[in-house]
């Protein structure tokens, strides 16, 4: 009877892990159209005692680059993240470069987080360009001299796959990811472009089907255990 109870406990544990993994698959599919979204994968680790632990890892593979007509759209071509700051001073990191000019004139994310330390676009800006090294250049009229008004920073991490999902397609640091370091490069940023999600629909659906089969097997095992319990109770009576 003790062995049967242990089997049931392990099966419940394993089923819980399967449901958690299914939740991450659903989130990945939901964000298929989200700019620069990075899928999360739930890695199952079988312990010596037969129980399953789970670890969350971020798939940092770069998504395809899509050309845009919006000068505020910026893509990272390579590794790295944009540091962005909330109104409360919280810092998170994103690859989603679908920026805008905020009501205060600063370069902002679509949900009003400030990019970097703050890059204010002049009210009389005729046009601006964002160079591959992140420098933001403003022109106040046609034929005028360029004026550098700031630089969009890029940072990197020792273990970016250990970053955790934060607020609205942003990432937060963890002990495993390490602290951010400024990337010093003349390349890496592309204006008039956005990165698409790296979600692979076929892989996610394949994982979902395997999870479904695994959960069906777990439920069948629970039914077998329940039948055995019922028979043992009847024999005792």
PLM regions and their residue ranges:
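Amphipathic alpha-helical polymerization modules
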Residues: 1-237
């Amino acid at each position: 009877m003790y062995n049967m109870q242990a089997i049931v406990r392990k099966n419940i544990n394993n089923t819980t892990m399967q449901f958690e993994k299914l939740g991450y698959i659903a989130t990945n599919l939901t964000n298929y159209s989200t700019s620069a979204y990075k899928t999360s994968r739930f890695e199952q680790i079988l312990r010596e005692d037969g129980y399953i632990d789970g670890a969350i890892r971020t798939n940092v593979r770069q998504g395809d680059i899509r050309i845009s007509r919006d000068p505020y759209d910026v893509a990272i071509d390579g590794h790295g993240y944009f540091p962005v700051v909330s109104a409360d001073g919280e810092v998170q990191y994103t690859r989603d470069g679908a920026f805008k000019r905020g009501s205060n004139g600063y370069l902002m994310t679509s949900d009003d987080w400030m990019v970097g330390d703050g890059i204010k676009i002049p009210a009389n800006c005729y046009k601006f360009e964002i160079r591959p090294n992140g420098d933001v250049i403003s022109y106040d009229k046609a034929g005028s001299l360029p004026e550098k008004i700031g630089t969009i920073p890029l940072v990197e991490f020792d273990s970016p796959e250990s970053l955790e999902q934060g607020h609205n397609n942003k990432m937060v640091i963890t002990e495993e990811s390490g602290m951010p370091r400024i990337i010093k490069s003349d390349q890496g940023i592309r204006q008039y472009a956005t990165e698409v999600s790296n979600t692979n629909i076929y892989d996610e659906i394949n994982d979902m089907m395997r999870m479904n089969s695994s959960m069906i097997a777990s439920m069948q095992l629970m039914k077998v255990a329940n039948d055995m319990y019922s028979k043992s109770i009847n024999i005792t009576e």
